[in-house]
Structures are given as structure tokens and as C-alpha cells.
């Protein structure tokens, strides 16, 4: 059996075993050095996040509510998206329901209480998601985009809930190397 040639942005690496990886083809791209990363981190203005991300201050639920006040989803607007515009509903963290050019899709569905491989430990949600896979008014989806396999972007329970609701016809767009994870969960439209 003859293999197809790899696209230009795919690269085989490894001396003792072969691994397919993505290679950035932009001439302007360069991997930052450790000293450049440290310099960048030190240049960040601490007041931008009031210490929540780079300091020892822990954000409270009230801080989150003030920064990201919850709004009810306008399901009537979702049911009738504008033809010539992009419409998006943020569910929380990485999850967005987007509608554009006649397509309705989700990004990085995470509906679980914790961004963790287990639900008894790990970072816990401060506010519930605006909608879940079980939301009755969630429209038909054309596809789901998963950006990468961190727990706060690829949530097993949410993926399985969407697959259970929409069935094998739901298309999944995932990064290189992630298809086996989906096929291992009996999701083959990847």
C-alpha cells in the first residue's frame, strides 16, 4: 500500500520512532527562547489582571460576576441567525456557539463542572455554562471545532453528550493526532 505524500505543514520527526507534528511555515516565526519568555512575563502590567493570573490573589465568585456578568441566552436570536453577519454565544471559558454563513457550530465544548480528567478534583467552574449539550433550545449543529486536547478545551463528558444528542452525523474538526482519541470513543466523523 502506497502512502500519500504529507502536506507541507506536516513533518515527521524522531530518530528511533516517527512522530507526525505540525510545522509552522511562516518565515517570520521563531521559537522564543527561555530568556525571551521571562522578559515578556516581566513586562506584563500586573494591574491588568489585578494579580489574579500572575500573583497570589485568588478571584472570588463576586469578582467573576463583576468581570463577566451572566446574561440569559437569547434563544429567539439563535433560532433566527442573521444571514449577513456572525452571531456568537459564549457559554463560558473556551465554548462558543457560533453562527455564520448558514453554519452553526461549537468551539471547544466544555460543560462539566471541572476542567479535569475526573470530576472530584481539579479547577472548578465559578459560574455555570450559559448552555449545555442538554439545553433543549440548542439548535442543530453542523460541526464542532476542537482546538487542542487540554482538559479545559476537550472535555470527554461534553463530547460524549454532544455525540449522544446529535449522533454519528455530527462532524468534528480536530488537530493532528487527535483523531484516535475520538475513534477510541466511537466517534468516527472526524
Set out the residue ranges of the language-model regions:
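Metallo-beta-lactamase
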Residues: 1-127, 131-137
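Active-site metal-binding motif and surrounding structural segment of the metallo-beta-lactamase
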Residues: 13, 120-174
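General small-molecule cofactor/ligand-binding pocket signal
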Residues: 89, 173, 190
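Short, polar loop motifs at secondary-structure junctions
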Residues: 92, 175-180
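Active-site metal-binding loops of divalent metal-dependent hydrolases
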Residues: 109-111, 149, 178
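Short glycine-/acidic-enriched loop or helix-start segments at secondary-structure transitions
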Residues: 116-117, 155-157, 183-184
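Helix-loop-beta element that forms the nucleotide-linked donor phosphate-binding surface
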Residues: 182-190
Amino acid at each position: 500500500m502506497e502512502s500519500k505524500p504529507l502536506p507541507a505543514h506536516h513533518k515527521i520527526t524522531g530518530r528511533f520512532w516517527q512522530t507526525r507534528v505540525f510545522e509552522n511555515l511562516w518565515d517570520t516565526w521563531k521559537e522564543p527562547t527561555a530568556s525571551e519568555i521571562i522578559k515578556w512575563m516581566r513586562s506584563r502590567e500586573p494591574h491588568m489582571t489585578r494579580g489574579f493570573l500572575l500573583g497570589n490573589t485568588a478571584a472570588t465568585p463576586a469578582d467573576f460576576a463583576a468581570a463577566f456578568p451572566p446574561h440569559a441566552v437569547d434563544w429567539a436570536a439563535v433560532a433566527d441567525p442573521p444571514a449577513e453577519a456572525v452571531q456568537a454565544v459564549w457559554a463560558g471559558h473556551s465554548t462558543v456557539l457560533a453562527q455564520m454563513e448558514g453554519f452553526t457550530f461549537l468551539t471547544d465544548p466544555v460543560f462539566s463542572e471541572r476542567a479535569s480528567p475526573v470530576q472530584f478534583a481539579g479547577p472548578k467552574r465559578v459560574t455555570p455554562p450559559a448552555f449545555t449539550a442538554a439545553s433543549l433550545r440548542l439548535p442543530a449543529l453542523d460541526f464542532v471545532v476542537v482546538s487542542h486536547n487540554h482538559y479545559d478545551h476537550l472535555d470527554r463528558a461534553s463530547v460524549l453528550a454532544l455525540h449522544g444528542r446529535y449522533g454519528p452525523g455530527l462532524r468534528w474538526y480536530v488537530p493532528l493526532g487527535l483523531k484516535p482519541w475520538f475513534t477510541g470513543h466511537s466517534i468516527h466523523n472526524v
